From Swiss-Prot:
<comment type="similarity">
    <text>Belongs to the transcriptional regulatory Rex family.</text>
</comment>
<dbReference type="InterPro" id="IPR036291">
    <property type="entry name" value="NAD(P)-bd_dom_sf"/>
</dbReference>
<dbReference type="InterPro" id="IPR022876">
    <property type="entry name" value="Tscrpt_rep_Rex"/>
</dbReference>
<dbReference type="GO" id="GO:0051775">
    <property type="term" value="P:response to redox state"/>
</dbReference>
<dbReference type="GO" id="GO:0003677">
    <property type="term" value="F:DNA binding"/>
</dbReference>
<keyword id="KW-0804">Transcription</keyword>
<dbReference type="InterPro" id="IPR036388">
    <property type="entry name" value="WH-like_DNA-bd_sf"/>
</dbReference>
<keyword id="KW-0678">Repressor</keyword>
<comment type="function">
    <text>Modulates transcription in response to changes in cellular NADH/NAD(+) redox state.</text>
</comment>
<protein>
    <recommendedName>
        <fullName>Redox-sensing transcriptional repressor Rex</fullName>
    </recommendedName>
</protein>
<keyword id="KW-0238">DNA-binding</keyword>
<keyword id="KW-0520">NAD</keyword>
<feature type="binding site">
    <location>
        <begin position="90"/>
        <end position="95"/>
    </location>
    <ligand>
        <name>NAD(+)</name>
    </ligand>
</feature>
<keyword id="KW-0963">Cytoplasm</keyword>
<comment type="subunit">
    <text>Homodimer.</text>
</comment>
<dbReference type="InterPro" id="IPR003781">
    <property type="entry name" value="CoA-bd"/>
</dbReference>
<dbReference type="GO" id="GO:0045892">
    <property type="term" value="P:negative regulation of DNA-templated transcription"/>
</dbReference>
């Protein structure tokens, strides 16, 4: 397998496959076909087969795919056995909602801390997550070996905060602002613009 050849679209589908395969495994299913995955995930069967082909000849004609083998493969690829330390920067409405969502209690992400400038929030514990002053980012991130940051600050602060995170050694940033931020080549950015996602959904509805 050559990770450099895996498309971004395929990479984003891998967690969906992993979750679906986990559910099938829990139900005692030994095998699954691309047609079944199409029905369960609403992903075209040809796309499923193409995605899986990145990892070699995983299936057999007339049999399908071995659920446990796929599950072990994606568990390794997605590093499910290794939890990444995550920090949320900006504990406004969205940041607070992400903390309360508690996704850090499952999967391979663990929210260790949050940062904000609001004195009413700084120094509090939000759903077991301590909130620190944003000026402590560099020291806290280094000390706690934070690898990933979720950015939910105002657009005007996005680049400044990103620079602090990069200086602290952050390797990945999930950017919920609409600002296009600059980072070094060795830092991965994943932009999440909810307004664009909504526009894409409405467009897709019109095509049906």
């Amino acid at each position: 397998m050559d990770d450099n050849k895996i498309s971004l679209a395929t990479t984003r589908r891998l967690p969906l496959y992993y979750r679906c395969l986990s559910e099938l495994n829990e139900k005692g299913e030994d095998k699954v076909s691309s047609a079944v995955l199409e029905r369960l995930l609403k992903i075209d069967a040809a796309t499923v087969r193409r995605d899986f082909s990145y990892f070699g000849q995983m299936g057999r004609r007339g049999y399908g795919y071995d659920v446990k083998i796929l599950l072990e493969l994606f568990n390794d690829v997605l590093k499910q056995d290794t939890a990444a330390n995550v920090a949320i920067v900006g504990v406004g409405n969205l940041g607070h909602a992400l903390i309360n969502f508690k996704f850090h209690k499952t999967g391979n992400a663990r929210i260790k801390m949050a940062f904000d400038v609001n004195p009413e929030v700084v120094g509090t514990i939000q759903s077991e997550v301590p909130v620190y002053d944003i000026n402590e980012i560099k020291q806290r991130v280094r000390d706690e070996k934070i690898e990933v940051a979720i950015l939910t600050v105002p657009n005007s602060q996005a680049q400044r905060v990103t620079d602090l995170l990069v200086e602290a050694g952050i390797k990945g940033i999930m950017n919920f602002t609409t600002e296009i931020i600059d980072v070094p080549y060795n830092v991965t950015i994943h932009d999440v613009d909810l307004s664009l996602e909504l526009q894409a959904l409405i467009y897709s509805m019109d095509q049906d």
